[in-house]
Amino acid sequence: TVIFIISCIVLGFAYYQVTSGINNGSIVKIIYVPIILGSISTFFIFWSLSGLLLRIFMSIKKIYYKGLNSFTLRQFSSKINTTVFSTTIICLMLFITICVLSSALSMKNSLNKNLTDLSPRDIELSKSSNVNLEESDLTDIKKQNLRLNFEEIFAKFGFDIDANFKNTVYFSLYFDDSVTLKSTLGSYYKITKKQYPYLRYNDYIILMTNSDYNNLAASFNLEKVTLKSNEYVVVGNYQEMLNIKNEALKRNTKITLNQKSYYPKYQKAINGFYEMESQKSEVGFIVLPDNALSDDKKIMNRMIADYNGNQADIEAKINSITEKTSFYTDYGLTLNTKKDIRDASVGLGAIVTFLGLYLGIIFLISCAAILALKELSESSDNAEKFNMLRKIGVDEKMINKTLFRQIGIFFMFPLL
């Protein structure tokens, strides 16, 4: 009884740790500890339970001596005693089955939710800015094309942006050599370098003006910000990277741009993104006051919009344009649509769901097979025992009912 109670407490603690006690991705290795504890405690639960159950039911004489209950309970107790290890393995397989199935369904639901939250507009376009037009491999025509804006480029293909798009928002991305991951971490850089030595600390951080971000935030249903002349905010949604940047923000880390210092408005990054996607992958860009960024630091112009009219017709027009290789090569454009993102995500979701169901069903079948083989291996012994019952006058109906109960309890017991 003592072993059973202790094992139940340890098993409960292990399940708590697996489900809610461990929620930090940086300590995921610790998850093996509760799994091992759960396995050991499950073994001792079954080891102690057979005799305990028998004693409990023997004390309840009305149940124990009713019909063939005494025979069924002793048979069940004997089976549990001889199958403690295999029953523990089956419980672990069922645990894995539940984890695989729930994880697959959770991932599918998460992908579907992300499609709604992270791809709120129908189309997005981006165009390189401040390209070095003196590069030798650029033709004269390409140099002229790179100077064109979105409307002028599409007009060349007979497509009117104003007529076919609505809710259009334009914004720009900037960079500065002095604003890198290393510089934005400040004093926290040395600590981060030891923990994550392979991060690309010299990569520059994407910058955006306050007004551009607020226009984008209104379109993407994100939180707007109002900055003072010496403030900045970090915006992103990839939590693992944001956890690092939040530590730097808590230290009031300043960034210097054009010999002027800027300090964080908040002590943690705010949720947001500038590129439509199917998963949260924005590692964090910086929003600065409008006068902090100049056009010579602009690296990309972007546009987001909804279709103004029949979606299929507009997409057909766009596809007829993008099928021409010159659209991308001669104009420095990239294009992405909600439909493209959804199609890619649906494929991934289907694969995840299929694998989850496949593995889950395989484990369930394996569990049933182990129990069935155990029953078959003991069928000769059981036959002799039931023959003895016939000899003492027990009718077939009662024997069949007892056999059904015995097998049913044996198959259902690991699920408890």
What are these regions (language model features)?
Residues 39-52, 306, 364-374:
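Hydrophobic alpha-helical membrane-embedded segments
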Residues 407-416:
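C-terminal transmembrane helix pair
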Residues 21-41, 327-363, 378-381, 388, ...:
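Peri-transmembrane interface segments
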